[in-house]
Amino acid sequence: MTTTKTTMLATLWMATAAATIGLAAPAHADDTPVNLPMTDDVRAELVQAGAVLTGRPASEFSGLRPGKTYYAYEPNATNPTYWAAAALAGPKSETAAINLQDQNSYMMFYKGADPAATWVPIAAGFGPIPAGEQPCPIPQSIRDVWQWPTGKCYPPPA
């Protein structure tokens, strides 16, 4: 009888543990993109990557422009990717300010899901890129999550 009680308790415990582990699975098990909150660490990484495009050190910028920063994850089974779009803000020198004009006025970024991956910046300035005229580097599914205008490659006006 003791063996049966022990076996039953062990079975019940394992079933409970399995159910608990199953409930902890990600809410998006499919390939649906997920909008992510911008963290201080990601913000610092984007400033660093964006500064590369300007040719100026990241220390010459105070951060990212509020209200124009986006961050998402695309859990694609073959190529999971993080996406971001932002504008550097608070240039601390005239040269840094000049380098944020035109081509560098808005930037898009991507990186793979590997923890060692780094952000790849893309200059998207010179005004908005209408989808179709020039391929938008950010997939439409991500732009939809960010609620950008349909078929456009830029955020909605503030």
In which residue ranges do the predicted regions lie?
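Secretory targeting and sorting signals
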Residues: 1-29
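Short, non-transmembrane alpha-helical segments in secretory-pathway proteins
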Residues: 31-72
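N-terminal low-complexity, Pro/Thr-rich disordered segments
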Residues: 12, 23-40, 129-130, 148-158
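Polar low-complexity intrinsically disordered regions enriched in Ser/Thr and small residues
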Residues: 25, 53, 58, 66, ...
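Extracytosolic low-complexity repeat regions of secreted or lipid-anchored proteins
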Residues: 83-158
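Structural signature of eukaryotic scaffold interfaces centered on beta-propeller domains
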Residues: 75-78
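Short linear motifs at secondary-structure transitions and domain/linker junctions
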Residues: 59-62, 81-87
